[in-house]
């Protein structure tokens, strides 16, 4: 009690402190217990997996708005990360804009405490089923705010739908859905929910049929209720249609209708207890919901009257109330014909307009935030409806105190700008319903929003307008204020023209309210304001006046910065004994490259409508000019994989100073960049100058100022589009090419000549100091020591080149391999070592963009040779930028590289060699390995920095030898691969003359062919490093989930997670056995569960195993292994105890078995598996590498695929087709056969003989008589189910066209169900047996077990 008192006191003080001026109230003990109970419950959006493909998101109605939005965003992000784009959300609660935007939810909601309509329930189940059938990974998410009852209804209905219609329903899934629904629809579930689920199940199974005739309600009788005053309200499709007078209940009370009330569809009854006094409120006694289309009526008299009797357990709210008499009943006297007079529903609504409106559900279709805005408007402008309310009260004979309590939105102080901001939706709120033609509007007391004023004096032609017009007499602040200029939209120019804004959540509107309240914002603050990316528009029309003011303010600040630029942006040169000064610009560059930098977490807007940061913002902003280019953010991604090499590569060079415009430069020869600069200054007369840090020549600084003032002043006179283009042009100029005269004039030519002379002298001094640099001299000495080793390896490589098998390097048109080529280029680079000028310029150009490998000609040697026209000093750039390919320690690459993990291979067995199609040309395998190696180096270049030439030359040696060794090791890859290698020339697989019949019994399968079940994989297709290399056919592409789990470089898309990052050489096993074939696709099943793994291995021999992704430990793997003996203390059973489970945990160094200290760390998952296939180590037994999928046998696979390839056909009798909507399964076949048989008996249809063929493409029907149709084809994706007649009826074949002697006279019936093209509904096609040797069961088994099984497997 002390804790409760303390909690109560703290709540009081919080109430007083947070809402000063309001009365502090006292919390009762009941309220305190309720609040404590709610506090103990989990708040926010909760995620619950009903099945592996059905998720429920729910949130209680008591959750605060802030907590709801935060948890909603978090839950949606988790689901999207787990399932990518394979999710779709159905919202069964009230529509909200934040749910639609964050989850992209489909609105299918209905009010709480009511059952959904049958139409809505059928639509949801059909959509769920269709979505799950589209892809095996598709996940359905059901969202509900306000409890789980509505989710439970949908789950239960979908469970019934699967039980009747679906073919691949799992017993576990059905049990999970049943258990979930019973938690909310069990003994305490509302009777109306159960009633509608029974309607739904009966309609699917065909036990009841839909009756679309209306019902006429004559009177309602209530018996055994306690004596109270009540009145009834009747809703049709949740719209109020009738309200009775107040009646005092007794033992038997009757509500007489003044005629008959016409009802059809979903009907909702409410019995409301009238208010006992004028100040008291009403309460609902009971409710009941039913559907007239599903009622089975039995007349009780000659007039056709029927009685629908509902007992206590069938009435909501009182079914479990012990205070109510158990004999309570409600009787509805109805008929299919109207009585003497029919009640006019419209008249009833007009007489009782107030009560039905306040108690209706018509506002449910509005979004919840829209409904809140509507309630605010009702509070703010209640004086508009004051007189109309009085008129309604006088016209209503029933006391207004009898109405129910309606939730009223929180009172909001009147503010004219609020309705204007949200006025775009007011036309949908039904505001006009409050102000009718006969309503009297009081005298106007102030400026009303345009959306409300247009309801008063709006023309007829504007009634259908979707968005409100902007009223001309609104004050300026009502339309927009100055602070709102920098937020994404501008009001329309014409006063009569509507404007449109993107939808935003309630939080966005709240932000805009706060921002609209800002006044007197200066232009400098506007210019420096960063616009959030979510507020920007992709297209903005002609800029308004405030746009120009922002541009002027920015340009003036730009000029001020230029006046100070020469002193702040001078280049620093170093000579012998000098230290290179660290510039602030390098910090900015590192911030761009770092993945966790601020610039990446908060990227600048890509559109011109975003904020432009001026030069006044920071000291180095002008140097980061490339960040102002919108394309930079469209292309930059720190985690993007390296791009494949283009046809031709352009190396851009440019200075890092804002004074020197840049231009693209193509290197066409192996020259020193200093020579290029000197030559360009003589030939072009560029007006560019660089100041000396030590000399500080004033004349050169003046030239800088004059040049830059002109360049930017010329730009300032351009349009905003040219201003953005200027940023790009400034990044694309260099001192080595002719100056773009768009940025210069003849008046600067004399100053440019002076700059040429000064620049030439400075560059010569730099080059002379570079020649005597001690670091360069020492590096040259070290590299010359390796020359002899290179010469010794040349002879061995040449000998290996001559010993290559036929059809390799020479056959592919490759040049002789020269390992010295790389060194010659490196030596040439050392003789032309670039100056700091060139290094600084190169660093300024890269900016952390994704690297691009060097191009290769089609006839290039497989060694890492640079293409013709590419300078050797390109290698020098690798040393100065971490985004360029760098040599690396080859411990990770040696014998452990997966070529197919980087490229997609196209295999054509008719070609003499395996080729890779990339960029429109064919590369041999040698060049393919070369490209793959280059791409791998780019992937790992960020973690490998080399500064010594010795390591660089050693890397060149390795690349030459590795490429040569890889080509030699792939000597079997160019063998001729033709179908004749596996099939005889006259094989039926290649050349079929006829389609075989359906197999009646299990016969001997066709001979085993690897191409039939293993996708063309064969034994000697090359070496496989670490079990993952192998031939090119042994791999799937990166997009295949079940491909090899071999990981390279710490990243893989083959599974949900990676098993290795960086590996330490001292603790990793590197020497792995070489395997001929990659078998990981058989033993690596990332998506299966623990139970599925047990079922897969239960009947397999010891040593059989499977690896899956662990669900309990994210990032880890689970190893399921079949052993020969159970663990100690476990009794033998059904075989599941023989399946042992081990956890493979990842670590920074690799993967290892958890809990096994004597186990080493393996660099990859494949390495662990293959090592344990040689020795058991800590496992109970050695792993046995599978030769086929453990889920199936090779014989089964080969027979299945061979039969599908050949197809099977026979002649049957086509009886007819029936549209069955979404029904499928045996129940569908039963009903369709009955319908078709009745049609044939009545002569409405004609049975004909057809040719029935089943193949991998689907089912094809050909009419043998050409009387009904010619040919019909049903795609394999459209076929859902096939089955025999459950009650085994017989069909008289003698009436069919094409019947002859020898055919079956009394034949059994069968059918298959297929989707109707371009529709979500199904059709059932019925057939009868015709040939004695081809029973219908053989056709059905072939469709289900061969065609549909293969479709599900693929």
Curated annotation (Swiss-Prot):
Bias type Gly residues, positions: 1017-1033
Any one of the GO BP annotations: positive regulation of axon regeneration
InterPro entries xrefs: C2_domain_sf, PH-like_dom_sf, Prot-tyrosine_phosphatase-like, PTB, PTB/PI_dom, SH2, SH2_dom_sf, Tensin-like_SH2
Biased composition (Pro residues): 408-417
EC number: 3.1.3.48
Protein name, per record: Tensin homolog
Location(s) in or outside the cell: Cell projection, Axon
List of catalytic residues: 144
Family, per entry: Belongs to the PTEN phosphatase protein family.
Subunit field text: May interact (via SH2 domain) with receptor svh-2 (when tyrosine-phosphorylated). May interact (via C-terminus) with integrin pat-3.
EC class: hydrolase
Matching SUPFAM superfamilies: (Phosphotyrosine protein) phosphatases II (SSF52799), C2 domain (Calcium/lipid-binding domain, CaLB) (SSF49562), PH domain-like (SSF50729), SH2 domain (SSF55550)
Tissue spec: Expressed in ventral motor neurons, including ventral and dorsal D-type neurons, and in a subset of cells in the head.
Keyword Hydrolase among UniProt keywords: yes
A single GO molecular function term of this UniProt record: protein tyrosine phosphatase activity
Every SH2 domain range: 1083-1187
The Phosphatase tensin-type domain, residue ranges: 38-207
Record's GO cellular component terms: axon; cell junction; focal adhesion; M band; striated muscle dense body
């Amino acid at each position: 009690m002390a804790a409760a008192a303390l909690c109560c006191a703290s709540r009081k003080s919080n109430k007083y402190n947070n809402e000063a001026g309001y009365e502090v109230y006292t919390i009762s003990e009941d309220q305190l217990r309720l609040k404590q109970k709610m506090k103990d419950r989990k708040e926010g959006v909760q995620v619950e997996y009903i099945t592996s493909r059905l998720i429920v998101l729910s949130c209680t109605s008591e959750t605060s708005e802030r907590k709801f939005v935060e948890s909603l965003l978090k839950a949606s992000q988790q689901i999207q990360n787990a399932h990518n784009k394979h999710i779709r959300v159905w919202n069964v609660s009230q529509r909200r804009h934040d749910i639609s935007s964050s989850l992209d939810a489909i609105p299918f909601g209905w009010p709480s405490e009511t059952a959904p309509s049958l139409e809505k329930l059928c639509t949801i189940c059909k959509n769920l089923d269709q979505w799950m059938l589209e892809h095996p990974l598709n996940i359905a998410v059901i969202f509900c705010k306000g409890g789980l009852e509505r989710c439970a209804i949908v789950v239960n209905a979908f469970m019934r739908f699967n039980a009747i219609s679906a073919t691949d329903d799992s017993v576990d899934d059905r049990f999970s859905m049943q258990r979930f629904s019973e938690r909310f629809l069990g003994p305490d579930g509302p009777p109306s929910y159960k009633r509608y689920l029974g309607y739904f199940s009966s309609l699917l199974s065909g036990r009841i049929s839909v009756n679309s005739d209306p019902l006429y309600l004559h009177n309602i009788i209530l018996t055994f209720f306690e004596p109270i005053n009540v009145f009834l309200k009747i809703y049709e499709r949740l719209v109020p249609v009738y309200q009775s007078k107040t009646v005092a209940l007794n033992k038997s009370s009757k509500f007489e209708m003044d005629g008959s009330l016409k009802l059809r569809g979903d009907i909702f009854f409410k019995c409301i207890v009238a208010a006992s006094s004028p100040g008291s409120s009403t309460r609902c006694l009971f409710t009941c919901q039913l559907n007239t289309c599903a009622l089975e009526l039995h007349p009780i008299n000659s007039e056709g009257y029927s009685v629908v009797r509902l007992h206590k357990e069938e009435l909501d709210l009182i079914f479990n109330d012990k205070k109510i008499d158990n004999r309570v009943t409600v009787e509805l006297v109805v008929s299919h014909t109207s009585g003497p007079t029919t009640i006019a529903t419209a008249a009833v609504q007009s007489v009782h307009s107030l009560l039905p409106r306040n108690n209706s559900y018509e506002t449910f279709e509005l979004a919840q935030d829209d409904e809140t805005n509507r309630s605010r408007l009702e509070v703010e402008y209640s004086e508009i409806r004051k007189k109309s309310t009085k008129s309604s009260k006088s016209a209503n004979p029933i006391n207004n105190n009898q109405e129910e309590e309606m939730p009223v939105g929180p009172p909001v102080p009147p503010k004219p700008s609020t309705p204007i901001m949200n006025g775009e939706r007011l036309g949908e709120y039904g505001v006009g319903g409050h102000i009718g033609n006969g309503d009297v509007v009081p005298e106007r007391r102030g400026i009303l929003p345009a959306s409300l004023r247009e309801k008063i004096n709006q023309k007829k032609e504007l009634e259908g307008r979707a968005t409100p017009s902007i009223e001309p007499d609104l004050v300026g602040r009502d339309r927009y204020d100055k602070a709102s200029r920098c937020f994404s939209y501008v009001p329309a120019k014409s006063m009569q023209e509507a404007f449109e804004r993107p939808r935003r959540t309630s939080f966005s509107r709240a932000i805009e309210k706060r921002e609209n309240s800002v006044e007197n914002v200066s232009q400098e603050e506007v210019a420096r304001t960063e616009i959030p990316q979510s507020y920007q528009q992709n297209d903005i029309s002609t800029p308004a006046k405030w746009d120009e003011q922002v541009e002027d303010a920015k340009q003036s600040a730009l000029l001020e910065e230029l006046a100070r630029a020469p002193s702040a942006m001078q280049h620093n040169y170093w000579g012998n004994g000098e230290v290179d000064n660290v510039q602030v610009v390098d910090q900015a560059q590192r911030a761009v490259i770092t993945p966790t930098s601020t610039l990446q977490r908060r990227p600048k807007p890509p559109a011109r409508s975003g904020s432009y940061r001026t030069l006044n913002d920071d000291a180095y902003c002008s140097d980061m000019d490339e960040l102002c280019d919108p394309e930079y953010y469209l292309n930059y991604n720190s985690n993007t994989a390296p791009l494949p090499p283009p046809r031709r590569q352009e190396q851009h060079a440019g200075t890092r100073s804002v004074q020197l415009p840049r231009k693209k430069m193509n290197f066409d020869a192996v020259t020193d960049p200093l020579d290029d600069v000197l030559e360009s200054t003589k030939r072009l007369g560029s007006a560019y100058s660089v100041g000396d840090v030590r000399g500080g020549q004033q004349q050169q600084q003046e030239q800088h100022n004059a040049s830059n003032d002109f360049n930017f002043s010329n730009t300032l006179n351009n349009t905003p589009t040219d201003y953005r283009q200027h940023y790009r042009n400034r990044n694309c100029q260099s001192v080595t090419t002719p100056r773009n005269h768009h940025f210069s004039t003849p008046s600067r030519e004399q100053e440019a000549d002076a700059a040429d002379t000064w620049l030439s002298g400075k560059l010569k001094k730099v080059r002379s100091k570079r020649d005597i640099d001690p670091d360069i001299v020492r590096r040259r000495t070290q590299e010359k020591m390796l020359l002899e080793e290179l010469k010794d390896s040349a002879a061995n490589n040449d000998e290996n080149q001559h010993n290559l098998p036929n059809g390799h390097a020479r056959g592919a048109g490759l040049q002789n391999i020269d390992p010295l080529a790389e060194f010659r280029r490196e030596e040439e680079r050392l003789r032309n070592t670039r100056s700091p000028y060139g290094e600084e310029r190169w660093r300024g150009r890269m900016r952390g963009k994704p690297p691009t490998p060097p191009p290769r000609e089609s006839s290039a040697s497989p060694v890492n040779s640079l293409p013709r026209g590419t300078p050797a000093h390109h290698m020098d750039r690798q040393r100065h930028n971490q985004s360029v390919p760098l040599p690396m320690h080859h411990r990770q690459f040696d014998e452990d590289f997966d070529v197919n993990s980087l490229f997609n291979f196209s295999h054509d067995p008719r070609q003499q060699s395996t080729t890779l199609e990339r960029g429109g040309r064919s590369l041999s395998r040698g060049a393919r390995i070369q490209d793959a190696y280059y791409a791998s180096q780019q992937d790992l270049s960020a973690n490998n920095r080399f500064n010594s030439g010795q390591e660089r030359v050693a890397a060149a040696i390795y690349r030459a030898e590795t490429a040569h060794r890889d080509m030699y090791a792939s000597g079997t890859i160019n063998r001729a691969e033709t179908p004749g290698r596996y099939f005889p020339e006259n094989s039926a697989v290649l050349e079929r003359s006829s389609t075989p019949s359906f197999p009646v019994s299990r016969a001997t399968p066709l001979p085993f062919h690897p191409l039939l079940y293993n996708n063309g994989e064969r034994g000697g297709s090359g070496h496989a490093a670490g079990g993952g290399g192998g031939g090119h056919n042994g791999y799937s592409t990166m997009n295949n989930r079940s491909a090899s789990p071999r990981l390279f470089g710490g990243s893989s898309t083959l599974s949900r997670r990676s098993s290795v990052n960086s590996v330490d050489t001292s603790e990793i096993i590197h020497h792995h056995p070489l395997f001929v074939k990659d078998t990981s696709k058989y033993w690596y099943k990332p998506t299966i569960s623990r139970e599925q793994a047990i079922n897969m291995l239960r009947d397999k021999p010891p040593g059989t195993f499977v690896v899956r992704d662990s669900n309990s430990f994210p990032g880890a793997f689970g190893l399921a292994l079949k052993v020969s003996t159970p663990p100690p203390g476990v009794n033998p059973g059904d075989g599941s105890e023989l399946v042992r489970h081990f956890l493979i945990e990842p670590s920074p160094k690799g993967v290892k078995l958890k809990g096994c200290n004597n186990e080493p760390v393996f660099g990859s998952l494949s390495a662990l598996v293959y090592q344990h296939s040689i020795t058991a180590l800590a496992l109970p037994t050695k792993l046995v590498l599978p030769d086929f999928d453990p889920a199936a046998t090779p014989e089964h696979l080969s027979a299945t695929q061979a039969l599908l390839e050949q197809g099977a056909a026979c002649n049957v009798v086509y009886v007819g087709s029936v549209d069955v909507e979404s029904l499928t399964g045996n129940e569908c076949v039963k009903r369709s056969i009955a319908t078709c048989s009745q049609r044939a008996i009545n002569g409405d249809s004609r049975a004909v003989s057809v040719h029935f063929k089943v193949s991998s493409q689907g089912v094809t029907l050909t009419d043998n008589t050409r009387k009904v149709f010619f040919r019909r084809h049903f795609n394999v994706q459209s076929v859902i189910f096939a089955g025999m007649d459950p009650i085994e009826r017989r069909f008289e074949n003698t009436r069919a066209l094409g019947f002859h002697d020898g055919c079956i006279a009394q034949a059994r019936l069968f059918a298959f169900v297929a989707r109707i093209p371009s529709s979500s509904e199904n059709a059932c096609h019925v057939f009868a047996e015709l040939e004695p040797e081809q029973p219908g069961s053989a056709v059905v088994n072939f469709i289900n077990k061969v065609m549909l099984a293969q479709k599900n497997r693929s």
